[in-house]
């Protein structure tokens, strides 16, 4: 009992920080400025002046470690007043790029670079412990034109020169990414009629619907209309009031006893009340101390009660790999920076400043956007079975309460078994335009844990093959 009181005391005295970026924290790796990293490539002036061929030629990446795969990279200006620029890296499909769908990947956070997706999850390359690249067998660019954007501004290589350039809500996120996408399709006009999909994971549960909704709205009057067909969200935080419900889940896993569950539920109820009162910052702080505690001097309640430092996969109490460190070290090499046209621009894999500006956004729901988008596009919501931070039952909580035209049918829809060849990959449920999938033996980052199945998952969705 004394220990329980002490935990509550520690919880209260450290109750003043944020629900921080959930990605593994890579070690600091400085850029050696004495080496020649070239200069940043800003493509917007060339695009605006109609110099498309020149822009594309300059954006080509030429480096011995990536020469086996065609790719393009550079900066797209999304706000001239604040000099806000977004970094992109684009990989044309290996098979039939003229007709292959264009897939945008957005990482979570808020403030995590999409280079995590590229190098740790679904891009054509993996950074080895020797800081060299090897090909990924199940890269999504096998049959997709694959686009990575560091989002929001201030994340990864993307940057702004004015504090007012940082996004503070999902409207800003949607606007900036849409501005970048329009320029991307001006740079690659042959792809404008290809099917387009917005995808992402984790806090991408906010970004993906925000960008999709922005495309829908801007397409009404836009000169360049984006051919959006669908959106896919992996382990996404979309509807916090109905998703942040960990006590029962951790109890069922055996990571909490009944007392721990009750303590979790006490604070979760307080958090939900704060959300309902639209006290976004207070709710943010509460749930951070419940789960993360990353930027405080005290462990989170989750850490105190379970002993876990990790919430991406309940089979691991600590991060089992150093892959994010290898990625950062590779990207900080001057020859690499010169090749990808970023020069000496600062690389921030997990931006605290982006998180600070987005803090009031975190606990707000975008379920209403998901409900609207189901009436216009196909929607895929998938979860890894072993995740904790955005676990499958928590996603199912919000989907069961989602107010959309297929809501009643969804509640009684039959679940199907999903095989990849002879392998049992997971389970799916489809009602009208909405598909929900559980991926077996995968944690928070599904393509990292189950790359073969993840490729099958996204390919079935983008090629409308069903499960």
Curated annotation (Swiss-Prot):
Its EC number is 3.4.16.5. The active site is at 202, 387, 444. Its main location: secreted. Expressed by the venom duct. Glycans are attached at residues 130, 169, 304, 322, 344. It is an enzyme of class 3 (hydrolase). Keywords: Allergen, Carboxypeptidase, Glycoprotein, Hydrolase, Protease, Secreted, Signal. One of its GO terms (molecular function) is serine-type carboxypeptidase activity. It catalyses: Release of a C-terminal amino acid with broad specificity. GO terms for biological process: proteolysis. Residues 1-18 form the signal peptide. GO terms for cellular component: extracellular region. Pfam families: Peptidase_S10 (PF00450). It is found in: Secreted. Belongs to the peptidase S10 family. This is Venom serine carboxypeptidase. The lineage of its organism: Eukaryota, Metazoa, Ecdysozoa, Arthropoda, Hexapoda.
């Amino acid at each position: 009992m004394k220990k329980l009181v002490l935990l509550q005391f520690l919880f209260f005295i450290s109750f003043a920080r944020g629900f921080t970026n959930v990605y593994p924290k890579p070690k600091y790796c400085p850029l050696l400025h004495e080496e020649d990293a070239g200069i940043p490539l800003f493509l917007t002036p060339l695009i605006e002046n109609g110099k498309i061929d020149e822009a594309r030629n300059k954006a080509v990446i030429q480096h011995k470690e990536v020469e086996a795969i065609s790719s393009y990279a550079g900066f797209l200006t999304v706000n001239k007043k604040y000099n806000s620029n977004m970094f992109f890296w684009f990989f044309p499909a290996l098979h039939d790029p003229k007709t292959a769908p264009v897939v945008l990947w957005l990482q979570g956070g808020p403030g995590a670079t999409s280079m995590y997706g590229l190098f740790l999850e679904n891009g054509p390359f993996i950074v080895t412990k020797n800081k060299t690249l090897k090909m990924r067998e199940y890269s999504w660019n096998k049959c997709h034109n694959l686009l990575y954007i560091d989002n929001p501004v201030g994340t990864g290589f993307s940057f702004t020169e004015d504090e007012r350039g940082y996004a503070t809500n999902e409207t800003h996120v949607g606007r900036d990414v849409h501005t970048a996408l329009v320029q991307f399709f001006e740079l690659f006009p042959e792809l404008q009629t290809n099917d387009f999909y917005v995808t992402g994971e984790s806090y991408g549960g906010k970004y993906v619907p925000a960008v999709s909704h922005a495309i829908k709205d801007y397409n009404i009057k836009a000169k360049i209309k984006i051919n959006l067909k669908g959106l896919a969200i992996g382990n996404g935080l979309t509807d916090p009031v109905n998703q942040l419900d960990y006590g029962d889940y951790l109890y069922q896993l055996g990571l909490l006893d009944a007392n721990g569950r009750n303590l979790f539920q006490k604070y979760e109820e307080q958090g939900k009340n704060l959300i309902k009162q639209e006290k976004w910052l207070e709710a943010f702080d509460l749930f951070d101390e419940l789960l993360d505690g990353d930027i405080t001097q005290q462990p989170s309640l989750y850490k105190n009660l379970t002993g876990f430092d990790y919430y991406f996969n309940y089979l691991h109490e600590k991060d089992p790999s150093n892959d994010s460190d290898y990625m950062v070290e590779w990207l900080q090499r001057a020859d690499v920076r010169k090749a990808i046209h970023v020069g000496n621009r600062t690389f921030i894999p997990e931006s605290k400043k982006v998180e600070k500006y987005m803090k009031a956004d975190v606990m707000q729901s975008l379920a209403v956007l998901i409900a609207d988008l189901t009436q216009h596009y196909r929607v895929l919501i998938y979860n890894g079975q072993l995740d904790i931070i955005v676990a499958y039952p928590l996603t199912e909580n919000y989907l069961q309460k989602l107010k959309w035209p297929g809501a009643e049918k969804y509640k009684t829809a039959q679940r199907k078994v999903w095989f990849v060849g002879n392998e049992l990959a997971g389970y799916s449920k489809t009602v009208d335009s909405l598909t929900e999938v559980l991926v077996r033996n995968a944690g928070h980052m599904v393509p990292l844990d189950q790359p073969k199945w993840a490729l099958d998952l996204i390919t079935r969705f983008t090629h409308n093959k069903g499960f």
